[in-house]
Structure formats: structure tokens, C-alpha cells
Amino acid sequence: MSTAVTITAPSVKHILLDSLVVMKIVKHVDSELHAGISEVSGDACAGVLTGLVFLEDSRLEITNCFPTVRNEPVMDDDANAAQQYEEQKQHEMLDMLRKFRTMNIDYEIVGFYQSHQFGAGFSHDLVESMFDYQAMGPENVVLIYDPIKTRQGQLSLRAWRLSTAALDLASKNDWRPELVKAAGLTYQNMFEELPIIIKSSYLNNVLMSELSLAKSCSSDKYSTRHFDLGSKKSLEKSVRAMMANVDELNKSIQSLTKYTIDKQRHDNMVFSLTQKRQQENESRVARGDPTIPMDDIKRIKAPQLQTRNGLLDELLASFDTNALADFSKTVTSENITKMFIAEAVAEEKVAGTKDRTLSSVSSTR
Amino acid sequence: MSRFFHAKEDSDSDTSSSEDEVEDQKVNKSAKFRDDLDFMAGPEEDEKRVVRAQKDKKFDELKGIIKQNRDAKSNKDLNRLLTGFDSLAKAYDKSKTVFQRQNVANPRFYIRSLVEIEDYVNKLWDDKDAKSALSKNNAKALPPLRQKLKKYIKDQQLQDLVTDYRVNPDEDGYETPEDEDDDDFGEVSESKAEKSPGKPSEKAAVSDSDSDSDDDDSSNWSSEPESNSSDDEDSVTKMEQLRRYFLKKEFRVESKDDKKEKKKRVIRVKEAVEEDDDADWTPVNREKSVVHFDPKEEVTHDVMIKKLNEVMSARGKRTTDRNQHVANLRKLLEVSEEKELGLGINVKISFCIISALFELNAKISDHMEYETFMTTLQTVNSLLDLLIGTDRVKLSVTYAEEDENLKDDTQEYRIQGSILIAVQRLDGELAKILQNADCHSNDYIEKLKAEKDMCSLIEKAEKYVELRNDSGIFDKHEVCKVYMMRIEHAYYKYQDQNEEDAGKLMDYLCNKIYTLDDEKRLRQRAMLCHVYYLAVHDKWHRARDLLLMSHMQAIVDHSDVDTQILYNRTICQLGLCAFRHGFIREAHQGLSEIQNTQRAKELLAQAVGTRQHEKTAEQEKIDRSRQVPYHMHINVELMECVYLICSMLLEIPHMASCEFEMRRRMLSRSFHYQLKQSEKASLTGPPENTREHVVAASKAMLNGDWKKCQDYIVNDKMNQKVWNLFHNAETVKGMVVRRIQEESLRTYLLTYSTVYATVSLKKLADLFELSKKDVHSIISKMIIQEELSATLDEPTDCLIMHRVEPSRLQMLALNLSDKLQTLAENNEQILEPRTGRGGYQGPGSWFPGRNERQGDKQKGSGGYQGERRGGQGQDGKRGNWGSQGGQQRRHPQKPRAF
């Protein structure tokens, strides 16, 4: 990571997303999900976004995108292989951009997209690439796509970028508790979300309205599919993920506690030593002796936070947990609503008997 | 004073006849010297006494200089003599103020030294040969010295003294005559000191009597104060020391001529001194010490009062023999009764006797002798009788000493003092006596008999109070104390027959205090005693309501230690009461506050804690003084057993129900500890003590074997140790067995529900020897409380079990919630980082035990308060008691509900 990065505050306020991009992302992620590639490689589907920035409207238009090449699993621990892949990837990306240019499509990179279940996949790597992109162009964003939601009949796309404070810390790659505290960084303000407006072509819009008017399709509106509570699996998954995150949080909190105690002790020690030395020096000055330098005191090693990335992991874990909790909350509340509706419907159809078999989700203790 | 010298002479005379002469001279001289000193020092003796040490210092200083001067003289070093004289004059000047203040005249040795120097200088001056023989320096020093001397004597107006001395000089043979003089001095002042210790007011009394004696011209009288002051062994020993001092000096005198024999003599003389140490002295003193009146004189009120004052003036002095003091007072009382001087005097003297008796032992922490206690008790008793008998005597603390009316027949007698305080103090002494007696000996039982007398005395005092309460002679507080004393002697006693009356009495007494007492302390104590009493007498509901109404549990932490002890006792007794009534949960709550600490005895003040290293000797003493006398003890073993049984009845079903839960919540830590201990043991033999019995019973119950459980709880051994200690043993036993059956059934169902698909109620009823109705009710209750997922099938009389496994999502959610809990805990720790074991205690704090031990560590020496409820556990516990009311309301329905 380069150290000399000038951080310019982004001016973009919202994102205009072409429906083409949406379609492409969905297709890419869904096909991969179906093929189970992401589970094999353990990597998120990702791609590059292209478009242009409208500074006067403080708007970012994303007009096209393309997927990046997946890392092929490295068979041997060949150090060269990874590098080769990286080069290959880079090469393909440039190639694609060149083709875009020749086809008169916007070839300016404005960010990248990734798919994460429940929209919660913020890892250290992601932050690093976000920093890279944002360093490249201050208006760059990341689109997080949630394939699970799509399965449930909804589209979930969210645009994020690192806040200036987080960017600042990332540029130093220093997430020590003191600095984080000084920057006033919490998991809530680490990332900034940008509102997305999906723009379809007029032709598209016409088609949509025609479809909605067409009688043959309208019966679909009232299908019982909407009452499907098939979210048990995903809930389980999200709870599981949450547990993992909480574990992570626990670990980092413990190390933070230890660090605070150590730090306090260290500070006290240094303080008392300095004071003693100062007194001694004063008396030495009075006697006319040379003073003893404070170097050795300064050299006493301050305690280190026992995590790899300082507070970053903790922040990310909190952020993820938050996202997961949001997901669980919405799903459960939706489910409860559905159940009530279902109950009412059922009562109407079969008067008198209440069917509680649906209530499998609600029967949590 | 001369008496001493004569006596000494007597004793010395047999040691060596050769000493007699010297001795005589000395005695004469000192006597003479003393006389004129006495004359000069007369009016302000006491002040001199205060600064004696200072005077001695000055004397030493002067003497040192004189000694130097003498050396210089013998060396004919006039230069040194001159400087020596200067410093002497200076030192004397400085010390003059001291002497003046003490009214000491110019010390004779000083005069003598002056005279000696003067003589010497004059001699030199006159003797031309000697003068010429002097060295140059010395010759130079001689004239100024002479002049200075002359001038000094003139300036200081010492001529008279000098001439006096010249007329009557000291013997020349003395080597160190000034020492002796000083000793005379010291002795005089010392004997003065003996004569007049104590406060100035007493001083005045003595001098009063002195002057009186002068007026009366009665030889008996004049000897009185002296005999008073000197009838003590202390003074004897002091005189003895003085005498030794003298004797030693005598050797020194002797040593001049007879050095060889010196050693022998020393031994001999010393022996002699030791021989006649006490034997010779004491009888003389005793003889003289008795109070007596001049037979010729008529004993009137005034004389009597004077005499009483005189005797009382010796009170509290270090030199006063306390027994003698009491005897003197007794004598006075006799005389006064004989002469019929009236009740006023009698009461006054009696009261003085009582206080003198109390003062027989000097330290407040020591307990009174039992015999003394009994005499005191009798004295107080008779005085009380006397006071009850007549309403003409008013004894009150509100009177000032000047207001006292002892002699005027026509008015009421007014005397300062309070019989109630005496009674109270007597009560305290009894407690101390009992505390210090060996509680397992017959001696204790003997001493305990005094308790009955004490009770009747207190009752009498109460009667007296009620009789005279209108006359306004009592302090409100005093009256409260009397009632309180009665309560404190009654509250722990169980009265079997005519229980109604006893209860009424207690109500009456407590109500008195509730209405009378202004400060809260007595009221609180009375309330606690009341609760205790009610609990002892099985009035559970009243006792509990009273305790809850008093809000004691909220304020007890801020009250004094004695009240806290009483509170602890009350809580325990209440717990036992609840147990007798079958309110297991309440009993458990009540007892766990004390039992969970593992220091029940200490908290009940029935034993002193073993952790000496944390306590200073002082604290230990205080702790000891707080101990509850043995006959008031609550049986700790019984309490522990009851507590464990309660824990068993509550905990075992609970354990069975959450066997698979990840985090078990323990109701009683000490019970779990006991269980674990027995599990750890590689070989479990048959139970020995009560604790092991309960643990064995618990294990049996956990297996659902109620019969075995019952056998462990109710058997001969337990009968002896536990059940027979209840006054209604059979009912309690029946209750416990019944509870064991019920709880065993519950445990059985919870433990083995997985094995059964259906159970017939009849079979269960047979198995646990309960009626089918009871089984039905218990099971229904369990179903309602969602402890058991099952349904009752009426037609077939079966219990149908439902097996519900939690879904995976539910399990996950539970796991997650656990994890979140630890996360929250860790988070708290960040906010409040603490080193060591202490940490966030939020979720764990429903259970007091853990915190308690922490509290101990943190403030081990915090007295009873900190020990009983350390750390933050108290809120939880407080809540327990508070919520008890709610549970209670549910509770009575328990047996009937289903």
C-alpha cells in the first residue's frame, strides 16, 4: 500500500445505476452460485464497475460492468502462481477496458462489485481493495449484492465507500485503539452508504407497464408464493454467521481489555520513571552535573494490541454483526407479518379452526 | 508523716546498732526541715506536685554545678571556681522561677554551697601565704570571685539564710550532704503527693477537712486525712523505696570508716528491708483506715455528709484500695442507719456503695467477680426496694449536685443519680460474666442462675418506673432502656404454657418502646427482638410481616454492629420458623443469608473469627465483648441441617430439570459444594454427621428413591441431633417427609420423562405413597409451570409425555444468546477494567455466595457488616426478601391448589 496518498473527500451524493449493470451482476452471481463455484473457491464473486462521474449533479453513473476472473485454486504452494494470476487478471481487466473503449462504452473504472450473503462480508481484504480503489479515484464505490435476497424475491444492492476518517487510517494501515478513538471511528461511521437509483431505459419502462397490465400475468400477483416462509435455512445461516462474528468480537474485546490494562500499567510506570528522572536531573543541574537523558525510558516498549489489524477486525465484525442482525430482524418481522396474514386468510377459508402449524419460526423461546 | 519515720526506725534498729546514731540525726534533721518546708509550702501543695519532675531536674542541675565547684575548690582552681560560680548563679536564677512557682524556698544545699564557697574564698583572702602561693591565673580570679559572691548574696537577699545556716550549719562529716537534703525534699514532696492526688475539687475537700480538724482541736481528726491517704499498699511500697534509698546512703556514710564490712551490710540491710516489707506495714495501715467518728461528737447530718464527702474524695484515686473504700462506705451506712439520719443519707450512701462496687475492677473490659456481682445485685435490689417503698426520696440524674437534699426532713429528699443506670450496668456486667465463663461447665449454670435474679430485678425496676413515672425524675431514655432490658431478657426464651400471656407481655413491652423511643436504635432493636420472639413462638406470619414492615433489611447495613448481630439472629430464627411451618423457600432464603457465608458462627456472634492476622488485638477484644452469651445461642448445626434440607428440597428438582442446560443456575452454593465434595470422595461410607446425612439423602432423591431419602433424613441419629430440638418435632418431621415425597416425585418425573411415553397416575401414587389426588395436583402444577411437557389424560388416568426437541434454529439462537452474554460481560470489563478476580458481576449476582467471598477478600476486617454482605450481592439478596411477600401470597395455596 502506498504511503503517500492524498485523500480527497468524495463529492458524489448518489448513484445512478443502469439496469443493465443490475442484470449483469445478478446473472453473474446467480450463475456462479448455482454452479457452486463460490463455495469451492471460497471467494466472493466480483467484478469491475465502469461509468462516469457527474460532478455538477454530484452523481455517479454506473453504466456497465464486467466480472473479473476468478482465482483458480493454486495446487502447489507455488509462489509464482499467485503472482502470475494477478498479472493475468490485471491483463484481462485492461483488455476488457480497451474493448469497452473501442465499443464506445464508458471505460472509466468507478468501483467494483462483490456478492456477499446477507450483505455482510466486510473483510480486511475488502477494506484494502476499497482503499485501493478510492485512492485511485475518490468517487469510487463498492456495490454489495446479496444473492440470498434475490432468491427470496427481492433485490438487494447497496453501495458503500470508506468514510474519510477510515480512509485516513487505512492509508497509514494503522488501526491502533488510540488512533481509532481519536478519529472517532465506530462501526456505524466507518462506511458510508450511498443511495442508489436504478435507471431503466424508456423501452424497458414501457415493457414493464405493459406486462403489469397484461391479464395473463396478473394472477401471479396473488400467488401464495409470497406467503412462503422458506427463510429458515437462511436464518440459521445468518445466526451461524453472527455467532462467528460474535466470537471474533469476544476475542478482540478480550485482547483489548488486556491491552487497556497493560497500557495503563505501562503509562503509570513511564510516568513515575520520568518524574523520578526529572527530579534527579534537577538535582544534578543544581550540583552542576550533566543530566541523564530520558532515552532509556522512552525506549521501554509500549504494549501491543494482540490482534493483527488493531481495531479493524473488531470494527468489521461489529459491522457484519449489525448487518446480519438487520437481516434477521427484517426476515423475522416479515415472517411474523406473513403468518398473521396467513392466519387471517386461513380463517376466512376454513372458519373456526386455527392452524398453528405454520408457526414454526415463531416458536422460539 | 512522722509515723513513717518512727516505724522505719523501729525496723532499722534491729539491723545494726551502729547505724542508729546517724539514722536518728538524719531523721531529726529531715523532720525539722520538712516542718519548715511544710509551713512554707502549705497553701499550694497541689501545684507543686504537678511540676515536680521539673524541680528535680533543676535540682540535679544545680547539684552538678556544686559538685564541680567543690572539685575546683579542692584543686584550688579558682578560675574554674569562678566560672562555676557564675554558672551556678545563672542556673539558680533560671530555676528560681520554677522554685517560686512551686513555692520551694531557696534550697538549703544551695545556701550551703554558697556558704562553703564564701568561706573558702574568705579564708584564702585572709590567708596571705596561701594567696601568694596561688598561681597567677588563680590569683587573678580570686578578687572578682569574692566580690561577686558578696554582691550576689546581697543582691539576692540571701544574707538571712546564710546567717541562718551559719548559726545552724550542717555537720561537716557529710561527704555529700546536699544529696541528702534533696532526698528529704523529694520525700516531702512525694508524701505530699500521696496525700493529695486526684482532682482539685477533692483536694479542696481534703484541705477543708484539714482546717476543720484544726478548729476542732481533735487529734483523731487531724490524723484522719493522712491515714486515709496512706492506708494503701502502694504508698507503703513507695515509702519502702524511699527507705531503701536512705539505707543505701547510709552505707555510703559508713563506707568512710568501714569499707570492708560494707558488702555484708548491704546484704543484711537489704534482707532486713525485705523481711519487714509487708508484714510490718499492712496491719498498721488497716488499723488506722477504718472510718470512725469521734465518740464525743454527736453524729449529725452535716458531719455525716462531710464524712461521706471525705470518703468519696478518695474514690477513683490510684492509691485508694477499692475494697477498703467499699468497706468504709458500708461502715458509714451502718452508722447512719444506727443514728437514724434519714432515708436521704441512706440512699445516698447506698448509691455510693453501688458505684464503688462497680468500680472494683479498674478496667471496663474486665468482667466483675461473680461474688461482687451478687453483692452488687443485692445492694441494688435493696435500694430499689427502699425506693419503691417510699416516695419521699427522689433519685434522678436531672438534679445537680448542689440541689441535693439529704438532710431536710420536711422536704422530699433529692439525690443525684440513677438507679436505672445502675441496673443497666449490672445487666451489662452479667453479660460480661457469662461471656467469660466456660459455657460447658457447671460453673456457667451456676452463674446463669443470677440471670433469673437479674430478671426479677429488672422487673422490679420496671415496676418502680411505672410507679414513679409521673414524678418526672426519669429520663425518657432511661425508661426505654429498662423496657429494652426486659425485652432482651425475654425475647429468646420459649414459653410453652400460657403462651398467650407471654406474647401479650412482649407486645406490651415492645409497644412501650415503639411509643417512647425517639431515637431509632432502641426501636429497631425492640422490633427485631419482637420478630425473634414471634418466630420462636411459631407466629410466622406476624413475625414476617413485622420484619417486612420494619424495613430492617434496608437499613441494617447502616446500623451498629450489635443491631446487625441481632438482625442476623432474627433472620435465622425466622428461617427456622418458616421451616417449621413448611415454607421451604422462605426458610431457605432466610437461612442462606447467614449460611452461605461459611461463617455463620461469627455472624451470629457465637464465636470469634479465626482470622487473627487481619485483626488487631483491639478489634479482637471488641469482637469478644460482642459475643452472645452461650445460653442465647442459636444451634448452628441445626441451622445448617435445616438449611441443607431446604436446599435439597429446592435444588434437587431444579437440578433434574436443567440437567441439559449449558449454564446451571445454582440456588445454593454451599449445598452444591457439599454435593461435589461427596462426589469427589473415592469411597462414600455411611453418613456420619448431619451434613453427610443430608447429602446422602440428596443423592437418593436425585435418583428418585424417596424412601432411602426419607431414611437418611429421619432416623435416630437425626432425631437426636435435629428433630428433637424442635418443640413440635413430630409435625415438622411429618412435613419434611411429605415434602420429600413430593419433591422426589417431581425429580422422578423430570429425570425419567424421556424414558416414559405414558405413566399411569396410580402407579406414581403407589410408588411415592401419595394419594392420587396429590399426584394429580403436583403434575398439573408442573405442566402449568412448563417444567414438564406432558398432558394428563383423564379417561385413562395417564400422563402422556410430549417430546419436544428444540429446533436447530432454536438451539443456535440459544447458543448465540449465550455468546452475546459473554460479550456483554467482556464489554463491561472494558468500561471498568479491574485486575484480579473481581469483574463484572451482573449476571452472576443473583447468587450471593460468590460475591460474598470476594467481599471478604476485599474488606476482611470490615466488621460484621462487610462480612455479612460483601460486595454487590446484597442488592440481590435484599430483593429476595422483598419479593418474599409476593411468593408468600402464593404459597399458602400450595397444598390446596390442585
Curated annotation (Swiss-Prot), chain A:
Annotated MPN domain residues: 15-166
InterPro entries: eIF3h, eIF3h_C, JAMM/MPN+_dom, JAMM_MPN+_peptidase_M67A, MPN
Gene Ontology terms: cellular component: eukaryotic 43S preinitiation complex; eukaryotic 48S preinitiation complex; eukaryotic translation initiation factor 3 complex
Swiss-Prot/TrEMBL keywords: Cytoplasm, Initiation factor, Protein biosynthesis
Cellular compartment(s): Cytoplasm
Pfam families: eIF3h_C, JAB
Annotated PROSITE patterns: MPN
Record GO terms (molecular function): metallopeptidase activity; translation initiation factor activity
Single GO biological process annotation from the record: formation of cytoplasmic translation initiation complex
Heme as UniProt keyword: no
Family membership noted in the UniProt record: Belongs to the eIF-3 subunit H family.
Function comment: Component of the eukaryotic translation initiation factor 3 (eIF-3) complex, which is involved in protein synthesis of a specialized repertoire of mRNAs and, together with other initiation factors, stimulates binding of mRNA and methionyl-tRNAi to the 40S ribosome. The eIF-3 complex specifically targets and initiates translation of a subset of mRNAs involved in cell proliferation.
Assembly notes: Component of the eukaryotic translation initiation factor 3 (eIF-3) complex.
Protein name (Swiss-Prot/TrEMBL): Eukaryotic translation initiation factor 3 subunit H
Native source species: Caenorhabditis elegans
Upper taxonomic lineage: Eukaryota, Metazoa, Ecdysozoa, Nematoda, Chromadorea
Gene encoding the protein: eif-3.H
Swiss-Prot record, chain B:
Residue runs in coiled coils: none
Functional note: Component of the eukaryotic translation initiation factor 3 (eIF-3) complex, which is involved in protein synthesis of a specialized repertoire of mRNAs and, together with other initiation factors, stimulates binding of mRNA and methionyl-tRNAi to the 40S ribosome. The eIF-3 complex specifically targets and initiates translation of a subset of mRNAs involved in cell proliferation.
Descriptive protein name: Eukaryotic translation initiation factor 3 subunit C
Bias type Basic residues, positions: 888-898
Residue intervals of the PCI domain: 630-806
Main location: cytoplasm
SUPFAM superfamilies: Winged helix' DNA-binding domain
Cellular compartment(s): Cytoplasm
SMART domains membership: PINT
Keyword vocabulary terms for this entry: Cytoplasm, Initiation factor, Protein biosynthesis
Bias (Acidic residues) ranges: 11-23, 170-187, 209-218
Molecular function in Gene Ontology: RNA binding; translation initiation factor activity; translation initiation factor binding
GO CC list: eukaryotic 43S preinitiation complex; eukaryotic 48S preinitiation complex; eukaryotic translation initiation factor 3 complex
Chain spans, region Disordered: 1-38, 162-238, 829-898
Biological process, per Gene Ontology: formation of cytoplasmic translation initiation complex; translational initiation
